Amino acid sequence: YISLRTALNSDEVLAVAYEYTYNGKTYQVGEFSTDGINAPNALILKLLKGTATSPQTALWDLMMKNIYYLGGNQIQSEKFKLNIQYKNDSSGVYVNYINEGAIKNQLLIRVMNLDRLDSRNEQSPDGKFDFVENYTIYSSSGRLIFPVVEPFGSHLRKMLNNEALADKYC
């Protein structure tokens, strides 16, 4: 994935050209400026972020929705705690579970696959965030990684296993 150190302004776009090898064959996406493109000809690139960012745009499905900046860097495991909460519509209280569907009363941190290990890194959830470098967190850059692609969308929808509830919570 690509992560920028500073956010783009709303009127700025991000596009790339790249080359990769698959099964011994080299492929190119877009054109490099060294390909002999001269002004005023257009340089063809792959758009990563346009000026409009909403679920209705074609780019929405290509965006990473599972990596979140925590607002700091050099995160230390012994000082870091994570809790995922949802504001209950009827009570107005923040809770760390959804009280309906196939995930009824399960901690959201567990539902999101962020609690699968105990303090000895054995397969036994303990109700605490699994601080696993390069899997659930990039501590040096302060990024939280959900190990599912769309944690609050398609993943939660699948876990709820009920279309009406999924429409309510996702």
Language-model region placement:
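Surface-exposed, low-hydrophobicity segments enriched in Gly/Pro/acidic/Ser residues
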Residues: 1-170
